[in-house]
Amino acid sequence: MNGLQSDAISHYLTWAKLHSNARFNLAASGVLDYPLAELPVHIEDLEIGGTGPYGYQPLMERLATKAGVPKECVVYTLGTSMANFVALTALVHRGDEVLIERPTYDPLLTILDHIGAKVRRFERLAEKGFKLGLGEFERKLTAQTRLVILCNLHNPSSTFIDESTMRQAGDMASKVGARVLVDEVYLETLFEQPWRSAFHLGANFVVTSSLTKAYGLSGIRCGWILAEPELVRRMWQVVDFTYGSPVHPAELLAVIAFDHLDRVRDRARALLETNRVLVNEFLVRHPDLDCDPSRFGTTVFPRLRVGHTAEFVRILREQFETSVVPGEFFEQPRHFRIGFCGATETVRGGLERLSAALEAFQPPSR
């Protein structure tokens, strides 16, 4: 097992759990919870025990079928957060060089700090729509790079990396002997656009994902890792340190959810399509924000043209009962993240209050 640093904490997750709640929550990035009553679940379908030593086989079969891979390439985890922790713990040793995008999801950096990795960064620039720039990416790779980390869709901007670009990034990483870990949890929201997991693009790809963000099934905690069988065996050994056995009722619920995923997907698609119109109309009305229209995902990441967001976010929550994620958690203090994946009335009301707060906001003079 790799050595771990005991003082690494995720300031973002602490904030999200303790300070993000508000009457109008635009901080969340996962689709509104799917009602359990709308799944054909009966109490007699559930059991306390019955899981296998390394995955409940009916669930493992569904995960493998969904991903189009053999079961030997799948690790079951309790959500994407655990998937990322397990994957990174298995892939990275203390002192290994890891190349990761900026901005990125804060807990990924925290895990790397926890492990003691040597972290290098490459920029995904706001003025270029946070697209993955292959030139910048290739320049930052070195002969010592052991792992590259990408989010697709990008968190926080929801920018999509197309298959050609992802394949080229994988080829560049392969030339220096590096693997590529891709967090694909938000890619599940590309309901209308065909896509393949990056796992199918090259032997050096490892992928994490879950049902938590795109489907409103966060409470089931169904996540997974896709990796080559040799890596999968190592990752299961990391899982052994996290629990003796998973929550079997959650595994059974996940099987039921997979068997009715079309129904769950249709509800999520309709919600996001409606809310995306609202957020894009909001962005058009606000030239004081710099942000491309939303095309994918559950979030946008606008930049305040004047002022920093820390004070604005505080005023928004305290005076307008609305929460967004401060850009400081993504190392972008002029930005903030808006989630538009809640109930439509909540999103509409939150955007109205966000408009009012922007009109009232007077950034402090220098």
Regions found by a protein language model. Give the residues of each.
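A short helix->loop->beta-strand "cap" motif at the edges of active sites that frequently abuts
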Residues: 96, 117, 175-179, 203
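Active-site phosphate-binding strand-loop segment of PLP-dependent enzymes
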Residues: 126-193
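Conserved core segment of the aminotransferase class I/II
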Residues: 201-273, 280, 352, 363
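PLP-dependent aminotransferase-like
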Residues: 6, 90-150
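Conserved glycine-rich beta-strand-loop-beta hairpin in the small C-terminal domain of fold type I
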Residues: 255, 271-280, 290-303
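PLP-dependent enzyme catalytic core of the Aspartate aminotransferase-like
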Residues: 315-324, 330-366
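Helix C-cap/helix->beta junction micro-motif
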Residues: 115, 175-176, 286, 320, ...
